[in-house]
């Protein structure tokens, strides 16, 4: 009987490959800093390995639980996400690099990032909401309800944890899920044009203000994006070092472990900027290979979403697909200076325990949906 059901080994293999590759690149990118700071070249890699193992165990457990089990916790997840975000402002809050975005879990040594919890819970909540609203999601009222639901969470993530990139991802997930549930192109064309117009206006204002920006952090980042050389010792330093890494890698790269920029030149080499180290050590070939792996991952999710047994399963997979796609695109765009630096990790590859745990939980949900697909439906 079980053989009549589908299990996506291709999806599982791609995820395992990205995790394994990520561990190799984290070791390569962080070994110098880790040895200099902690006396152990594999310090960051070991911590990530532990997070990956815990995440994989969680993924397997979630994959074997019927995904409808989680629907009853959708509203609870929304509330818990909000509470966790506010806990950042309590003594439990952990600061790093000038931002307080983590909660310290007592007696564990683990720091939890509430924004990662919010992304997963928002996918669950919106998938449940789409099913409850039914055809009314296609009305203008339904559209505003769906787009308004994630706004409080996204606003709190931005205002309380100062995490613009996660707020953008949460709203991006909502836009994609609403679009799939209600493919009314006019609303989304208008929304897209409005966002582009607002972004263009913001860039114009930054260009006109010039040196008057002063201490306004976000606007200063946009100015550094437009002309990183003018702030080579300040906001533009990380971007320039990342571009040097990408440019020096050429087509085939310098070779694994041969990066120069990781030698304390490039800040956050093992985290937000790990793609630039991939480009430096493995060249354009390595960068394209990783992008193709992400495309294959998204394609497998699209196949699962198209064949999901019901709407809730399909919307879960669409939400996870949107999360990974948006985050990967934003990370690569930041590293290549296509958009202003927002501080965002590369899924499955960058260093970060919270990100790995909750991304693997999302993959568990996708595999759970895939397991309920009957082979005769494919």
Descriptions of predicted regions:
Residues 1, 5, 327-378:
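A juxtamembrane structural motif centered on a specific transmembrane helix
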Residues 32-33:
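Transmembrane helices with small-residue packing motifs
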Residues 2-15, 70:
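N-terminal membrane topogenic signal
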Residues 16-20, 28, 38-235, 276-337, ...:
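Hydrophobic alpha-helical transmembrane segments of multi-pass inner membrane proteins, especially
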Residues 224-271, 285-286:
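TM-adjacent membrane-interface loops and short helices in multi-pass inner/ER membrane proteins
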Residues 163-168, 254-259, 269-271, 288, ...:
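Transmembrane helix boundary and interhelical junction motifs in multipass membrane proteins
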């Amino acid at each position: 009987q079980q053989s009549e059901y589908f299990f996506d080994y291709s999806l599982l293999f791609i995820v395992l490959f990205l995790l394994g590759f990520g561990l190799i690149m984290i070791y390569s990118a962080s070994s110098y800093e880790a040895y200099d700071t902690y006396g152990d070249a594999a310090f960051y890699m070991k911590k990530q390995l532990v997070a990956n193992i815990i995440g994989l165990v969680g993924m397997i457990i979630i994959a074997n639980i019927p995904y409808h089990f989680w629907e009853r916790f959708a509203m609870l997840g929304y509330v818990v996400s909000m509470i966790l975000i506010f806990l950042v402002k309590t003594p439990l809050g952990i600061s790093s690099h000038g931002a307080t975005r983590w909660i310290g879990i007592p007696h564990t040594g683990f720091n939890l990032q509430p924004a990662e919890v919010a992304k997963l819970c928002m996918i669950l909540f919106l998938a449940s909401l789409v099913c409850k609203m039914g055809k009314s999601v296609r009305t203008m009222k339904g559209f505003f309800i769906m787009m308004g639901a994630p706004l409080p969470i996204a606003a709190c993530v931005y205002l309380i944890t100062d995490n613009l990139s996660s707020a953008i991802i949460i709203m991006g997930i909502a836009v994609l899920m609403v679009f799939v549930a209600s493919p009314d192109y006019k609303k989304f064309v208008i929304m897209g044009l409005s966002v582009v117009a607002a972004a263009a206006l913001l860039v114009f204002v930054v260009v006109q203000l010039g040196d008057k920006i002063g201490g306004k952090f976000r606007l200063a980042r946009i100015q550094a994006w437009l002309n990183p050389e003018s702030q080579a010792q300040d906001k533009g330093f990380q971007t320039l070092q990342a571009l040097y890494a990408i440019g020096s890698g050429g087509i085939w790269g310098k070779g694994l472990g041969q990066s120069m920029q990781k030698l304390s030149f490039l800040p956050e080499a093992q985290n937000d900027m790990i793609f630039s180290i991939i480009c430096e050590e493995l060249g354009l070939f390595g960068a394209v290979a990783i992008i193709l792996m992400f495309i294959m991952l998204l394609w497998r999710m699209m196949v699962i979403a198209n064949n999901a047994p019901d709407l809730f399963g399909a919307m879960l997979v669409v939400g996870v697909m949107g999360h990974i796609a948006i985050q990967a695109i934003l990370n690569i765009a930041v590293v290549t200076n296509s958009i202003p630096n927002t501080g965002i990790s590369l899924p499955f590859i960058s260093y970060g325990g919270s990100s790995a745990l909750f991304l693997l939980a999302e993959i568990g949900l996708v595999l759970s949906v895939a397991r309920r697909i009957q082979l005769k439906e494919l």
